[in-house]
Structure formats: C-alpha cells, structure tokens
C-alpha cells in the first residue's frame, strides 16, 4: 500500500499572546494603534492568540477577531478562560480555544532532562553563533533600510536609525546607537545576543522573543547586551 499523502503530528509553536485588560474595543484599538506603529513590519501577519483571563465581563468575540485582523495580525483563537460555559460559547461561535499546559514540578524535572538530551542531539545540526562569520556594515543604517546577515553575525560600525531594521541569523553588534529594530537568531538560535553602545530601539527580538521600547526602560540610553535566559529576554549593562 502506498504511503498516505498526509500525516498528523503533534508539535509546539511560539505564538504571540495579546492579553486584554478591558472589554472596551475603543481602548483596545487605541493601544493597538500605538503598538503596531512602533514596528509595523514586525507585526505584519504575526499569529496572535487573545487572552481573556483578566476580563471580568463578557466581550464581543467576533468584534475582537475583526479588530485583530484589521491590524493585519493573523487571528488564531482565544485562551485564558477557566469558565466552561464561556469556552463552549467561544467554540460554538466558530473560534478556536487554545488550552495552555500547566506542568507540575516532577513533570518539569523530567521534561528538563529530556530537553538536555534533545539539545545534545541537535547541537551538531545547528552551529553556535560564535562559529558564524561576520558580516560588517560600515556607516549609518538609515530609516527604511534593512540589512540581513544570512547565516552570519552582523556587525554595524555606526548607528541604526529609527525606522531601520537589522537582522542576523547569529549575533548583532551595533557600535553606535540602536534606534530601529534588531532581530537576532532569526533562524532559531536561542543563544544569539544583541550588543549596542546606546539602546533606544523600537524593537529587539531573539529567536522570536521580542521587546518593544517600553520594555527597555531599565537600560534605556545605555550600552547593553540582550540575551535569552529561560526563554525570556534579559538585558545587562555593558561595563
């Protein structure tokens, strides 16, 4: 018998989650306008799950979906509700409800052990960022420009202007001010890092984890390096 043309498999993906703190659509719209304006290209067609856990009243689910898609996000579904009737209603309206997985301590230990083994198996397949060659750009990167270092680290000897974008599959070094968007580890390198002499970025991202400017207040205007710790972005001041 010939092999089937399709196969279903379980896997996991990193999705952006939009946490709603109000059911007022006008307020949600106003805040989305501000957020998307900071990095419109980055958010274009990004898959989004809407978390309704913090809402203390009902909301127009169809209106929320329409609003999300108006800003060119790809709407995936809702999450966060512990109310069975609410989840039932969401599904009856034709929307997906995405369950989050809660893992107890013993399970976490077992998963961590498996993760260490799995990581050791794929190390040879994915080169460390320090094995990459460097792509060097000399001079300022101006608004509207995009520089991509495919399978390389990116070294910018100059500043990255607001509205500009630098992308690398490895690390990003900016010997100047970083005012635009910096996306490191673009192909999935969780050990990628971002270095700059003056942090004033619109957005920074490593392996799909990102911060917008308001998340960088601690080291704003300072020389920093940004990296992932336990899948969370962390910034440290350079001495």
Swiss-Prot record:
Q: What keyword terms does UniProt attach to this protein?
A: Cell cycle, Cell division, Septation
Q: Which Pfam families match?
A: MinC_C (PF03775), MinC_N (PF05209)
TM annotation in the entry: none
Report whether Oxidoreductase shows up as a keyword of the record. no
Q: Does the keyword Phosphoprotein apply?
A: no
> What is the residue range of the signal peptide feature?
none
What is an annotated GO biological process for this record, any one?
regulation of cell division
Q: Quote the function comment for this protein.
A: Cell division inhibitor that blocks the formation of polar Z ring septums. Rapidly oscillates between the poles of the cell to destabilize FtsZ filaments that have formed before they mature into polar Z rings. Prevents FtsZ polymerization.
Q: NCBIfam families, from UniProt?
A: minC
The record describes its quaternary structure and partners as: Interacts with MinD and FtsZ.
Which PANTHER family does the entry link to?
Answer: SEPTUM SITE-DETERMINING PROTEIN MINC
Family named by the database record: Belongs to the MinC family.
HAMAP family named in the record: MinC
- For this entry, the protein name equals Probable septum site-determining protein MinC
């Amino acid at each position: 018998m010939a092999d089937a043309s399709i196969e279903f498999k379980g896997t996991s993906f990193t999705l952006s989650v939009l946490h709603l703190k109000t059911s007022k659509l006008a307020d949600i719209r106003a805040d989305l306008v501000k957020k998307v304006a900071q990095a419109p290209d980055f958010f274009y067609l990004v898959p989004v799950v809407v978390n309704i856990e913090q809402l203390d009243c009902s909301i127009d689910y169809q209106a929320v979906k329409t609003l999300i898609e108006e800003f060119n996000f790809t709407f995936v579904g809702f999450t966060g509700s512990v109310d069975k009737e609410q989840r039932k209603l969401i599904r009856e309206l034709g929307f997906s409800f995405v369950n989050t997985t809660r893992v107890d301590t013993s399970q976490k230990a077992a998963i961590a052990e498996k993760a260490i083994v799995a990581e050791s198996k794929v190390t040879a397949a994915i080169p460390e960022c320090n094995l990459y060659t460097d792509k060097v750009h000399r001079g300022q990167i101006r608004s509207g420009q995009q520089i991509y270092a495919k399978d390389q680290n990116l070294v910018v000897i100059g500043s990255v202007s607001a509205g500009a974008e630098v992308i690398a599959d490895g690390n990003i070094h900016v010997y100047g001010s970083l005012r635009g968007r910096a996306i490191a580890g673009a192909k999935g390198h969780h050990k990628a890092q971002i270095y700059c002499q003056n942090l004033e970025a619109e957005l920074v991202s490593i392996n799909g984890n990102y911060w917008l400017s308001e998340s960088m207040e601690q080291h704003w205007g300072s020389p920093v390096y940004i990296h992932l710790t336990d899948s969370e972005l962390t910034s440290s001041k350079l001495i």
